[in-house]
Amino acid sequence: MPRMRFLEVAGIVLGVLVLACVAGWGYWFYTPSIKPVPALDGELLDGSVTVDGIERNFRWYRPAKVAPSPPLVFVLHGSMGDGREARRMTYYEFDRLAERHGFLAVYPDGYEQHWNDCRAHAPYEANKKNIDDVGFVGKMIDFFVSQEHANPERVYATGISNGGQLAYRLALELPDRVAAVAPVAASLPDEANFDCKKSGKPVAILILNGTEDPMNPYEGGEVALYGLFGSRGKVISTDATVSYFAGLAGHHGPPRIVRYPDVATHDHSRAELQIWSDGPGPEVVLLKVEGGGHTFPHPFHRFPRFIGATNADLDAAAEIWRFFTDKRLGSPGT
């Protein structure tokens, strides 16, 4: 082959390879930009409390029309995030919900962008230094009850991934102050990886997990991206996690099943609710996303594809608030 012809062919092949790499990166890693929340009438405010000599920061959305003795919803970010990222990764939906329903949406910052959850083998500083994140949440509750007249019987917490793991810790260690939790893309650590104190008290809980999560394995196992990167130790299966909380609440019968219409066929996933409420304790719910990944479902936004499918049949924030709305400390079934 003449030299010029060879160079032409090589250039074409190289160009095709570059385009293929760019296309592949775009498909797996690109996330459509999430538009900033539309102008709402409320305020986004900043605050801080001191825990063990460390200043801990948070921000909160106060709607224009705050409900009398408003509920309090903590939205907990994932690893390498902060309160700003928690707002963005939940698509600003909790701000919108706060505006409609009058609750206070709170977005705290973890210690060095992580939470000290129940996983003993988590490698980040919040865990290594045993940062008191349960105490942090407790002090924030005190702040909002005192300064914003929040209802201490209607305190809720949700979070994704590392934030979901902290929600579990609150359920286990702070059930007398948190009326309900909703962990997303998270399961309880296994016995060898467990570093929390179990109160043994039931708590209302909604668990939202995807069956094809490449980081938090639905059937249990090592928490790492595709089982290879960034290990946080092992977790038990989603079903075992649900069974633990259902057992605490005294639910022993089969769950009631509610399937969501599969309106978004392009997302390669389907969702259903499994509801346990036959016993004397609080409601326990699994929102199972068949084919779902390490993501936060929404009809119009999605996470990068490399962490799995984002279900578009439902709005996760709205479902979580719907679960929270009738839960109160000390009331029957909660």
State the predicted function of each range.
Residues 46, 105-107, 286-288:
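Conserved beta-strand scaffold positions in the cores of enzyme catalytic domains, especially
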Residues 49-156, 165-173, 219, 296-307:
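Serine-hydrolase catalytic machinery in alpha/beta-hydrolase-like enzymes
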Residues 110, 211-214, 291-293:
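Acidic beta-to-alpha connecting loop that harbors the catalytic carboxylate
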Residues 5-72, 90, 96-100, 129, ...:
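A domain-start/cap signature at the N-terminus of enzymes
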Residues 74-78, 185, 209-210, 290:
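The conserved beta1-alpha1 loop
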Residues 125-131, 227-236, 307-311:
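A short acidic, glycine-rich active-site loop
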